[in-house]
Amino acid sequence: MTILKWGLSLAVGGFLIIFGVTKFTGGAHIFPLIEMNATDLGVPFAGLFFPVVNYVTGLLELVAGALVLLPMTRKSIGAPLAVLPFLGAVVFHLSPLLGVVTPNGYAEGADGLDAALQAGSGFEPSHFTAETGPVLFILAAAFLLLSVINAYLHKQG
């Protein structure tokens, strides 16, 4: 059982840290996509999705990832906290703000993308690749399941 707990903790923690880092390096294209969809739907404060919610989510992922990897914090806070980013991802993928099928990234050489990223607004469909798929949703759902199992196993002792 110890090997299973360690394996789950390493998988969940590593995934959270890797994806948390992308929120600060510009590699996460999902938040600009959410902002664009939220603006189109008339959601108040849509401009906060990128970069504010992007950075808050990245920070949560980094903290949860670190806490789930550290043995002294894993059981008390790390494993339960690690569920939240994945739950949020699944909820957003099931909402009209994101959807299950999403673009696979930024379009290469997208006109105005750098200016839009620097301004934090003004995203357009041409900024994202035409290739779409459910990969991010499947990853979010799979890691939600793994993080819930991890939290349950650590709660049981």
Which residue ranges define each predicted feature?
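Membrane-interface extramembranous regions
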Residues: 1-157
